[in-house]
UniProtKB/Swiss-Prot annotation:
Binding site for GTP: 165-172, 190-194, 212-215, 280-283, 320-322
Protein name: GTPase Obg
Function: An essential GTPase which binds GTP, GDP and possibly (p)ppGpp with moderate affinity, with high nucleotide exchange rates and a fairly low GTP hydrolysis rate. Plays a role in control of the cell cycle, stress response, ribosome biogenesis and in those bacteria that undergo differentiation, in morphogenesis control.
Keywords per UniProt: Cytoplasm, GTP-binding, Hydrolase, Magnesium, Metal-binding, Nucleotide-binding
Molecular-function GO terms, alphabetical: GTP binding; GTPase activity; magnesium ion binding
NCBIfam families registered for this protein in UniProt: Obg_CgtA, PRK12297.1, PRK12299.1
Record lineage: Bacteria, Pseudomonadati, Campylobacterota, Epsilonproteobacteria, Campylobacterales
EC number: 3.6.5.-
Domain OBG-type G: from-to ranges: 159-339
Cofactor(s) demanded: Mg(2+)
Domain (Obg): residue spans on this chain: 1-158
Stretches assigned to coiled coil: none
Binding site for Mg(2+): S172, T192
Natural source organism: Helicobacter hepaticus (strain ATCC 51449 / 3B1)
Length: 347
């Protein structure tokens, strides 16, 4: 099950108490203090785990506590330090304070390990409190308490390219054809219920990661449909690929305008992202001359509209994922766009 948001409770370990002890040996009647220090409590760390892309394991285990430090012993023996807790999260997980929603750390690189809570300091044994006025101190420090925090884990998948489109326009077919991703593909809306990542091998030396999210509908920024819940997963992408469908009721230009507006309402940053456009299902030539005329007319209308808006870096490509036409050209265009885009994580 895909889970991209969960809250958990974390606590570091308490420091161990210092010992009150006196040296006891044969022929030494009044030995001095020899109480050891308590061990420090364990810390709480968060670490990127590249072997997972979901927070589902946290649904059943929401409390994480490091071990307490052990008390000090005689003969100045220090107590054992408490074991740390290491919480492993997917790449792209943000750690926030649950109450204030303030960002604590963004786990956006791998490898990466960050200490969230330090364990309590162990108490000093009575050895430290001997002085001229008190040769046999009977006092030792208690260990300091650990820290506690209620945190929110928010996963934002990291990809180079984010697919954007209405439901059932061919996004899942496209990503499954280009990459190793295997989303469900069927002829009904909202086939894609969760985000999918796929690695596209562009050539012998280059590859990029593509993200497919559930389809967006008009009004998504206000909570309609499924796409709004997953738009955060394309916020980190360096490039957006709009998938438009000539078979829809809206024209190609209208589709792009609706999708762009929903992205801008969700995050103004997304509206500034470099993008390209693919026209899916361009293999429907068997529908006759009327379809071909409609396709050419709407494509020209979209090109003129984008030219007026001043988007020189964008491209428009007709493709067919079923017949695999236009896909090599698409990968080439995406690769070029990523290479000139500083936000890319191109490998």
């Amino acid at each position: 099950m895909f889970v991209d948001s969960v809250d958990i409770f974390i606590a570091s370990g308490k420091g161990g108490a210092g010992a009150v002890s006196f040296r006891r040996e044969k022929f030494v009647i009044h030995g001095g203090p020899d109480g050891g220090d308590g061990g420090d409590g364990g810390d709480v760390y968060v670490e990127v785990d590249n072997n997972t892309d979901t927070l589902s394991k946290f649904r059943g285990a929401r409390h994480y506590k490091a071990k307490n430090g052990q008390p000090g012993g005689s003969r100045r023996c220090s107590g054992k330090r408490g074991n740390d807790v290491v919480i492993k999260v997917p790449l792209g997980t943000q750690i926030l304070d649950f109450d204030t929603k303030e960002l604590i750390v963004d786990m956006d690189t791998c490898p990466m390990r960050v200490c969230l809570l330090k364990g309590g300091k162990g108490g000093l044994g009575n050895t430290h409190f001997k002085n001229a006025a008190n040769q046999a101190p009977t006092y030792a420090q208690s260990g300091l308490s650990g820290e506690e925090k209620h945190i929110l884990l928010e996963l934002k998948l990291i990809a180079d390219v984010g697919l954007v489109g209405f439901p059932n326009v061919g996004k899942s077919t496209l990503i499954s054809t280009l990459s190793n991703a295997k989303p469900e593909v069927a002829n009904y809306e909202f086939t894609t219920l969760i985000p999918h990542l796929g690695v596209v091998d562009a050539d012998e030396f280059s590859s990029f990661v593509m993200a497919d999210i559930p389809g967006i509908i008009e009004g998504a920024s206000g909570g309609k449909g499924l796409g709004i819940a997953f738009l955060k997963h394309i916020e980190r992408t360096g490039f957006l690929l709009f998938v438009l469908d000539i078979m829809r009721e809206q024209s190609l230009k209208e589709q792009w305008e609706i999708l762009s507006l929903e992205l801008e309402k969700f995050s103004p940053i997304l509206s500034q992202r470099a993008f390209g456009i693919v026209l899916s299902k361009s293999d429907m030539q068997h529908l006759g001359e009327e379809f071909a005329d409609k396709f050419d007319k709407q494509t020209q209308e979209l090109e003129q509209f984008l030219a007026q808006k001043g988007n020189p870096q964008s491209f428009i490509l007709p493709i067919s994922s079923i017949q695999k036409s236009g896909l090599k050209e698409l990968v080439f265009e995406i690769l070029n766009s990523l290479r000139i885009n500083p936000q890319s994580i191109l490998q």
